[in-house]
Amino acid sequence: MAMKKLLIASLLFSSATVYGAEGFVVKDIHFEGLQRVAVGAALLSMPVRTGDTVNDEDISNTIRALFATGNFEDVRVLRDGNTLLVQVKERPTIASITFSGNKSVKDDMLKQNLEASGVRVGESLDRTTLSDIEKGLEDFYYSVGKYSASVKAVVTPLPRNRVDLKLVFQEGVSAKIQQINIVGNHAFSTEELISHFQLRDEVPWWNVVGDRKYQKQKLAGDLETLRSYYLDRGYARFNIDSTQVSLTPDKKGIYITVNITEGDQYKLSGVQVSGNLAGHSAEIENLTKIEPGELYNGTKVTKMEDDIKKLLGRYGYAYPRVQSQPEINDADKTVKLRVNVDAGNRFYVRKIRFEGNDTSKDSVLRREMRQMEGAWLGSDLVDQGKERLNRLGFFETVDTDTQRVPGSLDQVDVVYKVKERNTGSFNFGIGYGTESGVSFQAGVQQDNWLGTGYSVGINGTKNDYQTYSELSVTNPYFTVDGVSLGGRIFYNDFEADDADLSDYTNKSYGTDVTLGFPINEYNTLRAGLGYVHNKLSNMQPQIAMDRYLESMGDPDASDFAADDFTFNYGWTYNKLDRGYFPTDGSRVNLTGKVTIPGSDNEYYKVSLDTATYVPIDNDHKWVVLGRTRWGYGDGLGGKEMPFYENFYAGGSSTVRGFQSNTIGPKAVYKNGAHTSWDDNDDYEDCTQESGCKSDDAVGGNAMAVASLEFITPTPFISEKYANSVRTSFFWDMGTVWDTNWDPSSAPSDVPDYSDPGNIRMSAGIALQWMSPLGPLVFSYAQPFKKYDGDKAEQFQFNIGKTW
């Protein structure tokens, strides 16, 4: 009864009248409403203890302290004689958190944001925080143009003061831009200006960048694009006065109006450089030269500032400040650019450290460095080290960090942070390819043997037409100067007829050794010696083969053996940004070989492969790839180049959409030769005196292949796997011909195989995936230019480890 009177009194009078201005001595403290929170924990959070004399201010502080714990959503403090009665209502505990209706935002991202706000399973539920989260999520949807979106938190009570929390999303549809207006433009049309925007009110089918869905961030980017467009064309006084974004009543349409002031065009009258140039005034002035009467260009000014910083960075000035201040003369419409440079301190490298290389030895990474310890810091040298590490192929990512040495004004440590990839593989499996049929592979390949950088491989494969095995070893640093040494031994049993070639069997084995000589950062020369033994059998006489056998002095042979020694040479230019799935740069690879004295054959052979990647966006997700492959070979000393050394085209690695090796010259079998076999191994003979035409490819001594690809982001693939999957649209073309072909030696219905103009073409789509099994390549191509005897194969794929 006394407590009820006290509560009524507290509503009618101030706290001072309740507790008394002089206060009272607390004899005991009682709690009501505690469930999850222990009494001891609650007492520790209070500033009042038994025996204290308390007044109104102490009671207010007690209430605030209990609220501050975050455990209570209601607190009342009452007096019952000399007992302090604390009535609390605990906040419920979150038992579970679920989401419904969220399509644009993933559950994991929502959980991270909730946890950052203190909302997680097992914690108390703060309804105020929940309201802020609802509003924040709705603001996010508004920023991406979904103005009809709503987010509601549904709290379901459970026993023992627990609750289930469910966030219910109604995302709605994105508001589409109905019209973009630019007001105040006179020099350029609205259509011209909007054509450079990401946001559009109209998007043609071919525009893969434009978007009618409104997003606040994209609008901000487009306004910067508009500003740069004018500043780059001399409009130094250009200004965006205001921007209005209007929403239609149904919240499904957006109207954007941008008000601008163009101003006049201004020309640069000169550039004045001042400040601490660190003795490099001449080089800096070369970077600031302008042509007389050149229009003011904001992008060029920014590039000039960056170039000055890079120049100073190469000389150890790691943190230079470069500021350009345009002085505008409205009278003669000119701009004088005043550039202030402060080179700052020159920094020296105390240490170069590596992090993340758990397998690779420090020495393997350190030998790729161009920046030296103890020397001044060169930003270009640090970047070269990063490029070289990337090209090793040992790492998924390589990052650099320049860290100042504590207590030093002129020293830094350079840290290379790497994430190693699995450079070794033990493979035993089965694959299938449209070109090779069922294939069995087994092998051990380690590109970074025991962390030493050595490449060691024991590999083998067996399919419908080939049995192949190889042992190879390469030491990329045979000498401290970077001269590499590589060698291999191999065995190959090749059934040509099963590979859609003219019929013969070749059992070969051999070895070679090669030295690589680095010329500079991007160029390497190679030279080596090789030996190969070829044992040919089951040769069915055909014109190209007969020509070779005649040049060897054994025209009627059905079996033949040759031992050849070769001088092998090559040159590689490699400026790709990374080893696998590159997106920028070029690679040129020239290889060749020529027989040397002691060989049964006398011939030479040269191949040239090129690849150029050109990114068309800043993120390197859209890339144009151009590839070419050229090959030529011929005999020496009156002998022919062996037919089994011919070039071939067709298949997934050359001209897609055609069966492997089927492009180019076909076998013309001589009278009496076995020309074809059925399923019972019964054969038919050629009975024509002039020879029999066939569809069996024989290749040629000359080849030309070109490909143009447009690499695009792969749909439905998350960013996590973007670097292991690649999609592209392609156009392939190529041909193979025989420069020694004599049309008079064949029947009249046989094409002229010496004509290089018989070009095949195809177009299609390809998907590449670096799967756990190894490379997996799908392609679908439609040949749209082909010739008699060509074999089309629209869908092609290869699964399994390739060597």
Swiss-Prot record:
GO cellular component annotations of the record: Bam protein complex
Claim: Membrane is one of the keywords in the record: yes
Official protein name in the record: Outer membrane protein assembly factor BamA
InterPro entries: Bac_surfAg_D15, BamA/TamA_POTRA, D15-like, OM_assembly_BamA, POTRA
Residue ranges annotated for the POTRA domain, each copy included: 24-91, 92-172, 175-263, 266-344, 347-421
Keywords: Cell outer membrane, Membrane, Repeat, Signal, Transmembrane, Transmembrane beta strand
Signal peptide: 1-20
Protein's cellular compartments: Cell outer membrane
Family the UniProt entry places it in: Belongs to the BamA family.
Reported function: Part of the outer membrane protein assembly complex, which is involved in assembly and insertion of beta-barrel proteins into the outer membrane. Constitutes, with BamD, the core component of the assembly machinery.
Species this chain originates from: Salmonella heidelberg (strain SL476)
A GO BP annotation: protein insertion into membrane
Quaternary context: Part of the Bam complex, which is composed of the outer membrane protein BamA, and four lipoproteins BamB, BamC, BamD and BamE.
Repeat listed as a keyword: yes
Top-rank lineage group of the source organism: Bacteria
One Pfam entry name: POTRA
